[in-house]
Amino acid sequence: MARTVFCEHLKQEAEGLDFQLYPGELGKRIFEHISKQAWGDWLKKQTMLVNEKKLNMMNAEHRKLLEQEMVNFLFEGKDVHIEGYVPPEK
């Protein structure tokens, strides 16, 4: 049976992650309060950010920027701004 969490991003009960995907205290917080769906949404935004801003994960400043964007997206309800990107109409 799938584990459920109250997802802070979706603001509803949803299927939780199978295991902690991110290290440290932030990873524990994500595991306990973020759903699979919200994590998947973040991964799409993360890919766009890395590509559009040409982030290098070997650069500590770039990793810090990406982590802050992740916290903003998952816990603070702030969408990721990618210059020039217009989301498709639903």
Curated annotation (Swiss-Prot):
Pfam families: Iron_traffic. InterPro entries: Fe_traffick_prot_YggX (IPR007457), Fe_traffick_prot_YggX_sf (IPR036766). GO terms for molecular function: iron ion binding. GO terms for biological process: cellular response to oxidative stress. Belongs to the Fe(2+)-trafficking protein family. One of its GO terms (cellular component) is cytosol. Keywords: Iron. The keyword 4Fe-4S does not apply. This is Probable Fe(2+)-trafficking protein. PANTHER family: FE(2+)-TRAFFICKING PROTEIN-RELATED. Could be a mediator in iron transactions between iron acquisition and iron-requiring processes, such as synthesis and/or repair of Fe-S clusters in biosynthetic enzymes.
